[in-house]
Amino acid sequence: MRITHLAASNWRNFKNVEFDVGERLFVVGPNAAGKSNLLDVFRFLADIAGPGGGLASAVDRRGGLKKVRSLFSRNNAKGRLAVDVTLQDGDDSWRYRLSVKGEGKGPNRPVVDEELVVKNGEELLKRPDDRDRNDEILLTQTHLEQIASNQSFRSIADYFDQVQSRPPDHPRPLARRHRRRRPLRERFHRPDERDRAPTS
């Protein structure tokens, strides 16, 4: 399985972004152009689907909905943060769409505005459904993160969970940060005859 197309709205510094994903993808641009933010879309889905993760955790570890949602969101897509991915698994084509909004009351938790799963043109999941409307707290969790609810599309959850990348809030490896640096003289000094040990 692999992602073949991605579209997102109100994601970090992007009002709207959409592109195909080939066998190999290069993301280039100047500093602060949003390259890391773009790649974080994939980590975001992994954090939702992974063990001990979930929607609330994925949003919280990025500083909350205000930090994740674009500054353009007030006048774009009703302020919803949306991620829409198309995936290919052999002969099977999948689509997963997640739209998130603020609860609008109390702690303003992130809640599911829309969750959609389509396989080969057949709609397997569309939320909110009747259960969600009768118990709105269910919308604080995606079905992607729930083993009891994602049986029909667990292969997507397993795929997202395999995304391997250093999380945005994870420090650089200690080996890189604290590796021993040689004294300046050792790094730039070329030994001459006086530095060499005498030979017999």
Predicted regions span which residues?
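Conserved P-loop NTP-binding catalytic core
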Residues: 40-105
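N-terminal pre-Walker A segment at the start of P-loop NTPase domains
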Residues: 1-15
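Electropositive, glycine-dotted interaction segments
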Residues: 90-200
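The conserved Walker
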Residues: 31
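Conserved lysine of the Walker
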Residues: 35
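Hydrophobic residues positioned within well-ordered beta-strands of beta-sheet architectures
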Residues: 4, 17, 81-85, 96, ...
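Hydrophobic anchor at the beta1->P-loop junction of P-loop NTPases
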Residues: 27
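Phosphate-binding P-loop
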Residues: 16-22
